[in-house]
């Protein structure tokens, strides 16, 4: 089987492209009775530019991307014997079901779990709020901390910026970069 390629020489760029016939094997050089003719030679041979460089490129070729459904992490075991071994260590037989407890106990347990948040969950949320406040102690335009040389300025929409960053921003737009309201700020510095 073969193919074709057009010439990329500068002299041929002006006119019609030139095609070169390159057979894949020596047998294609001799026309047989069934393949005689120019049309059949072009369909079975390979056309290549004479000036084509066939050496291996020195550039790095990136590997093929991973399939989207590939799971990263520890491999999943599909052997039924190993699954049975893991299941035998756990005691699913001893778990209480709703039939064992009675239907009213199950409903009471479910409603009490939903209505009463645990104290540990509440403390986790407070810890996250403290971390967010600490992370937001920088200018949202340049992401640098506030200091004496570049002070903090609070706008009427209660967003904080460096004075220099906000003045530069106002040259391009009169809207707040965070909430898109009109930027109005006090003359006093915070």
Swiss-Prot record:
Output the PROSITE patterns linked to this UniProt entry: ZF_RING_2
Q: In which pathway does it act?
A: Protein modification; protein ubiquitination
Enzyme Commission number(s)? 2.3.2.27
Entries under CDD domains matching the protein? RING-H2_AIRP1-like (cd23116)
- InterPro entries named among the record's database cross-references: Znf_RING, Znf_RING/FYVE/PHD
Q: Does the keyword Metal-binding apply?
A: yes
Catalyzed reaction equations: S-ubiquitinyl-[E2 ubiquitin-conjugating enzyme]-L-cysteine + [acceptor protein]-L-lysine = [E2 ubiquitin-conjugating enzyme]-L-cysteine + N(6)-ubiquitinyl-[acceptor protein]-L-lysine
Q: Name one Pfam family in it.
A: zf-RING_2
Zn finger (RING-type) location: 139-180
GO biological process annotations for this chain's record?
Answer: protein ubiquitination
The UniProt keyword set, sorted, is:
Metal-binding, Transferase, Ubl conjugation pathway, Zinc, Zinc-finger
Instruction: Report the GO molecular function annotations.
Output: transferase activity; zinc ion binding
The signal peptide here is none
The function of this protein is: Probable E3 ubiquitin-protein ligase that may possess E3 ubiquitin ligase activity in vitro.
Protein name (database record):
Probable E3 ubiquitin-protein ligase RHB1A
The scientific name of the source species is Arabidopsis thaliana (Mouse-ear cress)
- Provide the gene name from the record: RHB1A
């Amino acid at each position: 089987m073969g193919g074709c390629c057009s010439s990329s020489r500068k002299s041929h760029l002006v006119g019609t492209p030139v095609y070169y016939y390159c057979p894949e094997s020596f047998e294609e050089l001799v026309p047989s009775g069934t393949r005689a003719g120019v049309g059949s030679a072009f369909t079975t041979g390979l056309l290549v530019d004479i000036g084509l460089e066939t050496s291996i490129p020195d550039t790095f070729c990136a590997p093929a991307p991973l399939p989207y459904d590939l799971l990263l992490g520890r491999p999943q075991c599909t052997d039924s014997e190993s699954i049975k071994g893991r299941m035998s260590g756990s005691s699913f037989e001893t778990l209480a079901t709703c039939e064992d407890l009675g239907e009213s106990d199950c409903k009471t347990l479910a409603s009490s779990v939903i209505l009463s948040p645990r104290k540990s969950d509440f403390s986790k949320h407070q810890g996250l709020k403290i971390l967010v406040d600490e992370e937001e102690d920088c200018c949202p335009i340049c992401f640098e901390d506030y200091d004496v040389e570049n002070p903090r300025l609070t706008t009427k929409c209660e967003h904080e910026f460096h004075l220099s960053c906000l003045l530069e921003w106002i040259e391009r737009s009169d809207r707040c970069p965070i909430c898109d309201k009109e930027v109005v700020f006090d003359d006093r510095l915070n």
